[in-house]
């Protein structure tokens, strides 16, 4: 069981990283809420991990905090929710927002996540309600502050060129597709979130936040 990983960040794409640990490269899948906190390429990275072994694949999932890892582990115990859907949930909302959804039984907001319909949202609330409430203090403690990342610091750069803007748009769409959104929806979300964004991470964050706000 691999429960934690620390190494050098070699590659980073939305939802997937390559981390060098003593010369061995580990592919680690992460939610966008973890991706936003990452440093630059060649920087040190430390993640809490959950290792899943299947007949056709072995996959490692990483999280910025032990709390997020525990929330992920509770999510994948829910009938009908696999690792990909759990990652999509934690990409669209942080643990605190998810807790609010569970407390308020906000089925409509949960159903905005790709792969979750109304019935699955209702089942999720029923199966995870008590467990998540027991973690409330941990969840609120870790979300009391805001982490500044290298992605955030790039927000003050000059407006992007057309070529760079297209690259950011395409990368953002690819990330949203990886999270389970349909092509048409992914393009619409990315286009609406572009604005003066200078990184794909910024566009993805705004797109996912916009999806949540539109349902409130």
UniProtKB/Swiss-Prot annotation:
Q: Which SUPFAM superfamilies match?
A: DNA helicase RuvA subunit, C-terminal domain (SSF46929), Nucleic acid-binding proteins (SSF50249), RuvA domain 2-like (SSF47781)
Segments carrying the region annotation (Domain I) are 1-64
Is the keyword Phosphoprotein assigned to this protein? no
In residue numbers, the region (Domain II) covers 65-143
Q: Where is this region: Flexible linker?
A: 144-163
One GO biological process this protein is involved in is: DNA recombination
Q: Main site of residence? A: cytoplasm
State the SMART domains in the record. Answer: HhH1 (SM00278)
Q: Where in the cell is it found?
A: Cytoplasm
Q: Name one GO cellular component term.
A: Holliday junction resolvase complex
**Region feature Domain III, mapped onto this chain:** 164-216
Which keywords describe this protein according to UniProt?
Cytoplasm, DNA damage, DNA recombination, DNA repair, DNA-binding
MF (Gene Ontology): ATP binding; four-way junction DNA binding; four-way junction helicase activity
Please indicate which superkingdom the organism of origin belongs to.
Answer: Bacteria
Q: Write out the domain note.
A: Has three domains with a flexible linker between the domains II and III and assumes an 'L' shape. Domain III is highly mobile and contacts RuvB.
Q: Which family does it belong to?
A: Belongs to the RuvA family.
What does the subunit section of this Swiss-Prot or TrEMBL entry state?
A: Homotetramer. Forms an RuvA(8)-RuvB(12)-Holliday junction (HJ) complex. HJ DNA is sandwiched between 2 RuvA tetramers; dsDNA enters through RuvA and exits via RuvB. An RuvB hexamer assembles on each DNA strand where it exits the tetramer. Each RuvB hexamer is contacted by two RuvA subunits (via domain III) on 2 adjacent RuvB subunits; this complex drives branch migration. In the full resolvosome a probable DNA-RuvA(4)-RuvB(12)-RuvC(2) complex forms which resolves the HJ.
Please describe what this protein does: The RuvA-RuvB-RuvC complex processes Holliday junction (HJ) DNA during genetic recombination and DNA repair, while the RuvA-RuvB complex plays an important role in the rescue of blocked DNA replication forks via replication fork reversal (RFR). RuvA specifically binds to HJ cruciform DNA, conferring on it an open structure. The RuvB hexamer acts as an ATP-dependent pump, pulling dsDNA into and through the RuvAB complex. HJ branch migration allows RuvC to scan DNA until it finds its consensus sequence, where it cleaves and resolves the cruciform DNA.
UniProt-listed NCBIfam families: ruvA
Name-wise, this protein is: Holliday junction branch migration complex subunit RuvA
Its gene is ruvA
């Amino acid at each position: 069981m691999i429960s934690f990983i620390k190494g050098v960040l070699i590659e980073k794409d939305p939802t997937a990283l390559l981390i060098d640990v003593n010369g061995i490269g580990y592919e680690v899948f992460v939610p966008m809420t973890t991706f936003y906190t990452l440093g630059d390429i060649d920087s040190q990275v430390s993640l809490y991990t959950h290792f899943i072994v299947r007949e056709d694949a072995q996959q490692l999932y990483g999280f910025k905090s032990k709390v997020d890892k525990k929330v992920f582990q509770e999510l994948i115990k829910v009938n009908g929710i696999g690792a990909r859907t759990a990652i999509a949930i934690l990409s669209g909302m942080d643990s605190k927002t998810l807790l609010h959804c569970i407390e308020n039984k906000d089925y409509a907001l949960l159903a905005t996540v790709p792969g979750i319909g109304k019935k699955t949202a209702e089942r999720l609330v029923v199966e995870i309600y008590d467990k998540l409430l027991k973690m409330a203090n941990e969840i609120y403690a870790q979300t009391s502050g805001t982490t500044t990342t290298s992605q955030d610091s790039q927000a003050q750069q000059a407006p992007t060129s057309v070529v760079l803007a297209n690259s950011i748009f395409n990368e953002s769409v690819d990330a949203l597709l990886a999270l389970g959104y349909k092509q048409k929806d992914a393009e619409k979300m990315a286009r609406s979130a572009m604005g003066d964004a200078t990184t794909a991470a910024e566009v993805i964050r705004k797109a996912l936040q916009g999806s949540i706000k539109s349902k409130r």
